Curated annotation (Swiss-Prot):
GO terms for biological process: translation. Belongs to the universal ribosomal protein uS3 family. This is Small ribosomal subunit protein uS3. Keywords: Ribonucleoprotein, Ribosomal protein, RNA-binding, rRNA-binding. Residues 39-107 form the KH type-2 domain. SMART domains: KH. Transmembrane segments: none annotated. The lineage of its organism: Bacteria, Pseudomonadati, Pseudomonadota, Gammaproteobacteria, Candidatus Pseudothioglobaceae. Binds the lower part of the 30S subunit head. Binds mRNA in the 70S ribosome, positioning it for translation. PANTHER family: 30S/40S RIBOSOMAL PROTEIN S3, SMALL RIBOSOMAL SUBUNIT PROTEIN US3C. GO terms for molecular function: mRNA binding; rRNA binding; structural constituent of ribosome. It comes from Vesicomyosocius okutanii subsp. Calyptogena okutanii (strain HA).
Amino acid sequence: MGQKVNPKGIRLGIIKDWDSKWYASSKDYSKYLLSDIKVRNYLFKKLINASVSRVQIGRLVNNAKVTIYTARPGIVIGKKGADIEQLKLIVSKMMGIPVHINIEEIKKPELDARLVAENIAQQLEKRVMYRRAVKRVLGNATRLGAQGIKVMVSGRLNGAEIARSEWYREGRVPLHTFRADVDYSSYGAKTQYGVIGIKVWIFKGEILDHKKGTLDEVAHRGAINQIAKK
């Protein structure tokens, strides 16, 4: 059976960027990685109503920068910035260094894979028919400029005794084209019949000229790294 690699992971260094940006020695690497995971889990749980898509963490020597991408920046900032100051204190304590928090607004949440998957999950938890929920997000995405969108829902759909998977697609989603800007996310909807898994792929167009270099340049860098390891 053919298995699908994560579309964002395979494009790292080509047209996608890392969510964690720092260098560490071998003894500190696992500590920094675990710290990043804890911070992300806390922020996603704390800001569950703020439509947070991703959290980018950058570390310097004595401080860190956390960028929160959200469709509802007002909820994150709070009244007169009170909520974001509290977040800053908690995250600084978790990471053990001073932290600066930036907020980036997502202009079109209908074209963000995580927010689309989260939207479908919320509708399923409110007992909306899954076909209606999926077709609604397909229409919204194509109307706002997506060249293609694909959605898979898996589990006991409509309370069926036997779990199954169903696919829905609008437009095209070229997973094998590295220059294709494909956003991907998965999410779980907790219903009374169990968890329903949701996967979303959104194709936004091709990136022909990017600062991270062409595919040949990326392959060349990979070859140099292999030689250096030897």
